[in-house]
């Protein structure tokens, strides 16, 4: 009985690992200037919640949508801290994390050094990048994957002393306007706004006239 349970858990873990990993593609690549953002809502939210930095990376189909969003956001930035002499590649060292959000409610989740908030109009991300300037930050989208990279100047002669940051966020297809992403880098804080498509703008539902 015990050996059967172990085998099932191993198989499930392997399938999940393979489903999260996919090769990065150069096609459909978009880059965004960190000067492009014009506005950002900084209003406080009484429902801000700290996320467990060791959040699960599995997303069972039976889970509630708010639970899924909680785990996703917690995983996205779980390893994203700045420490000279180390490089952080986000969850799983290069793995992409699917971002699944509920469309009928607004959310805000935060942790040390980051904040993610969803409204009816957009997804708002704030990431602390102390020591980096806007020239050190690169934001791009490759096949619906939002990629945030930051690398500062070396401190001294050692190459490992440079501050580095990398995170990948898979955005649901046909839900966000990836060509209208806005970003602003100011005083070591990166703010990114990803506008959402309105229901009438989405083309995934086609009505067929019956004659």
UniProtKB/Swiss-Prot annotation:
<keyword id="KW-0496">Mitochondrion</keyword>
<keyword id="KW-0346">Stress response</keyword>
<dbReference type="InterPro" id="IPR008978">
    <property type="entry name" value="HSP20-like_chaperone"/>
</dbReference>
<feature type="domain" description="sHSP">
    <location>
        <begin position="105"/>
        <end position="211"/>
    </location>
</feature>
<protein>
    <recommendedName>
        <fullName>Heat shock 22 kDa protein, mitochondrial</fullName>
    </recommendedName>
</protein>
<feature type="transit peptide" description="Mitochondrion">
    <location>
        <begin position="1"/>
        <end position="31"/>
    </location>
</feature>
<dbReference type="InterPro" id="IPR044656">
    <property type="entry name" value="HSP14.7/HSP23.5/HSP23.6-like"/>
</dbReference>
<dbReference type="GO" id="GO:0005739">
    <property type="term" value="C:mitochondrion"/>
</dbReference>
<dbReference type="InterPro" id="IPR002068">
    <property type="entry name" value="A-crystallin/Hsp20_dom"/>
</dbReference>
<keyword id="KW-0809">Transit peptide</keyword>
<dbReference type="Pfam" id="PF00011">
    <property type="entry name" value="HSP20"/>
</dbReference>
<comment type="similarity">
    <text>Belongs to the small heat shock protein (HSP20) family.</text>
</comment>
